[in-house]
Amino acid sequence: MTTNHLTDPALSPQDHEDWQCFVTLLQQAFAENLQHPILQLLLTPDERTALATRVRIIKELMSGKMSQRELKNELGVGIATITRGSNSLKFASNDVKAWLEQQLLK
């Protein structure tokens, strides 16, 4: 698989360092079965809902069963939200897409 921690050009060096700290903290939380309380502490209910919606968007786009417009209507989100998910998928590596397929399209 490709490197898991590529530098994100959209982030400043400090933001990248902070992001890596967050990812490391989450990895440790999952290792110690503390993921739910840590995510509830760090994310607002709206942020948790937005992340869950983003996963659903990625899943539905990968399955190809609905058009972007149908997905927008089903989820009650803006077309720009669907487009961001679609654009993210376009730039994901083949390894990441294959992993997502295994996880989301079982």
UniProtKB/Swiss-Prot annotation:
GO molecular function: DNA-binding transcription factor activity; sequence-specific DNA binding
GO BP terms in the entry: negative regulation of DNA-templated transcription
Start-end of DNA-binding region: 68-91
InterPro entries assigned to the protein according to its UniProt record, in alphabetical order: Trp_repress (IPR000831), Trp_repress_bac (IPR013335), Trp_repressor/repl_initiator (IPR010921), TrpR-like_sf (IPR038116)
GO cellular component, one term: cytoplasm
Major location category of this protein: cytoplasm
Keyword line: Cytoplasm, DNA-binding, Repressor, Transcription, Transcription regulation
Subcellular location as annotated: Cytoplasm
Metal-binding listed as a keyword: no
Pfam families per record: Trp_repressor
NCBIfam families given in the database record: TrpR (TIGR01321)
Subunit structure: Homodimer.
Family, per entry: Belongs to the TrpR family.
Function (record text): This protein is an aporepressor. When complexed with L-tryptophan it binds the operator region of the trp operon (5'-ACTAGT-'3') and prevents the initiation of transcription. The complex also regulates trp repressor biosynthesis by binding to its regulatory region.
Protein name as catalogued: Trp operon repressor
Record gene name: trpR
